């Protein structure tokens, strides 16, 4: 290098490089999926997204303990929404799929409720609030909600994901 020159790139060069990447990109992410990281639901969730919703290879996947509980907590809400915003903005997401499930430790598990109907009602209420919060922050998004359950039949796990309207 000549005297006074450095190997550092100027910020404008990086901006042009990334701008060109986004300008030339023709395929974008179809959805942002937000789900709990409970190991009992991992495989079933992937199968549901890939096969039943037809999203294989077309979504960003954010898995956090308790899923929407962090969005309900005013102390962590902004942090969570800002993290979601990165995916929404950079990958041009137009829809969000939020999955919650029965027996979630974030809610104290099923034992914290008198009946499974009470658990479903409480978590569904939070899912709907999450949809409202996402809609306030990201007005263009369509938000779809699902509640997952496990049934046991002859030692086999049977999963069901019910859409919450």
Where are these regions (language model features)?
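Short Gly/aromatic-enriched secondary-structure transition segments
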Residues: 46-54
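Short coil/loop linkers at secondary-structure junctions
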Residues: 55-56, 94
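A short beta-strand-loop structural module common to alpha/beta enzyme folds
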Residues: 57-67
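Donor-sugar nucleotide-binding helix/loop cap in glycosyltransferases
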Residues: 98
């Amino acid at each position: 290098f000549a005297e006074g020159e450095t190997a550092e790139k100027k910020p404008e060069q990086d901006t042009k490089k990334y701008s060109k990447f986004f300008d030339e990109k023709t395929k974008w992410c179809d959805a942002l999926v937000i789900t709990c990281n409970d190991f009992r639901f991992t495989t079933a969730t992937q199968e549901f997204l890939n096969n039943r919703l037809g999203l294989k290879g077309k979504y960003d996947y954010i898995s956090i303990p308790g899923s929407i509980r962090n969005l309900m907590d005013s102390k962590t809400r902004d942090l969570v929404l800002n993290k979601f915003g990165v995916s929404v903005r950079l990958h041009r997401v137009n829809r969000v799929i939020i999955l919650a499930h029965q027996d979630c430790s974030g809610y104290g598990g099923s034992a914290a409720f008198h009946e499974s109907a009470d658990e479903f009602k409480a978590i569904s209420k939070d899912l709907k609030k999450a949809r409202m919060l996402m809609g306030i922050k990201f007005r263009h998004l369509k938000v779809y909600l699902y509640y997952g359950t496990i049934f046991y039949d002859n030692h086999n796990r049977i999963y069901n994901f019910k859409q919450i309207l």
